[in-house]
Amino acid sequence: MKKLKLHGFNNLTKSLSFCIYDICYAKTTEERDGYIAYIDELYNANRLTEILSETCSIIGANILNIARQDYEPQGASVTILVSEEPVDPKLIDKTEHPGPLPETVVAHLDKSHICVHTYPESHPEGGLCTFRADIEVSTCGVISPLKALNYLIHQLESDIVTIDYRVRGFTRDINGMKHFIDHEINSIQNFMSEDMKALYDMVDVNVYQENIFHTKMLLKEFDLKHYMFHTKPEDLTDSERQEITAALWKEMREIYYGRNMPAV
């Protein structure tokens, strides 16, 4: 696509949203509690801040403000306000804010921000544990959140990923013509590396005329040892391995397709 000569600021808002899932089987109550504690510590507010700060570097954004919070009994959230233009480091607020940001910041936050929320979860009887991370990278201007696609998926353990990308608003060129998108895209998959595409089965659901793009990803390879917490598959009987494999695979397919499925 030919580079546009714009009149004033690029007013297009580009939003990239992820839902990333990590699935685990923990046999006992103690193991389930241990998994939740492990994943909660692995993705605490400080670690998430590091990931999102690197994301800002990748997409070429400047950090204006960071708000982060760990929650009891589990979970964390981080929100980073970003700008396209360089800012004076002396004016950046890097202090922690456990509550809402000031109104002036919230108003700006709607335009360019990066945020993540985590949701560790377990079933009290079935042994299945799920960690979900919701990430949104929303930018206003020429910054493209798609640049951070590979990095974010690699940084978080991802068995299942759902991705949404949309472009909203319009910008004008020097002749006054409106442009509702400023780059070529027909699939989110085009912004993924070949090694990543080789790891996942993927399906697209796109609404091109509305500039809405959706991709679902499910890990191709299933190795039971990667889904067990503090239990080795070789310590289980054949029937136990088959039962746990069926339960995990059913859980993953239900999350991937977004609906409950009958037991096989």
Curated annotation (Swiss-Prot):
Active site, renumbered: 112 (schiff-base intermediate with substrate), 117 (proton acceptor), 140 (proton donor)
Protein's name according to its UniProt entry: S-adenosylmethionine decarboxylase proenzyme
PANTHER family: S-ADENOSYLMETHIONINE DECARBOXYLASE PROENZYME (PTHR33866:SF1)
Pfam families according to UniProt: AdoMet_dc (PF02675)
Required cofactor(s): pyruvate
Gene Ontology biological-process entries: spermidine biosynthetic process
Pathway this chain belongs to: Amine and polyamine biosynthesis; S-adenosylmethioninamine biosynthesis; S-adenosylmethioninamine from S-adenosyl-L-methionine: step 1/1
GO annotation, cellular component aspect: cytosol
Post-translation changes: Is synthesized initially as an inactive proenzyme. Formation of the active enzyme involves a self-maturation process in which the active site pyruvoyl group is generated from an internal serine residue via an autocatalytic post-translational modification. Two non-identical subunits are generated from the proenzyme in this reaction, and the pyruvate is formed at the N-terminus of the alpha chain, which is derived from the carboxyl end of the proenzyme.
GO molecular function, one term: adenosylmethionine decarboxylase activity
Keyword field: Autocatalytic cleavage, Decarboxylase, Lyase, Polyamine biosynthesis, Pyruvate, S-adenosyl-L-methionine, Schiff base, Spermidine biosynthesis, Zymogen
Lineage of producing organism: Bacteria, Pseudomonadati, Pseudomonadota, Gammaproteobacteria, Enterobacterales
Family: Belongs to the prokaryotic AdoMetDC family. Type 2 subfamily.
Subunit annotation: Heterooctamer of four alpha and four beta chains arranged as a tetramer of alpha/beta heterodimers.
Gene3D superfamilies: S-adenosylmethionine decarboxylase
InterPro entries per UniProt: AdoMetDC_fam_prok (IPR003826), S-AdoMet_deCO2ase_bac (IPR009165), S-AdoMet_deCO2ase_core (IPR016067)
Site (Cleavage (non-hydrolytic)): 111-112
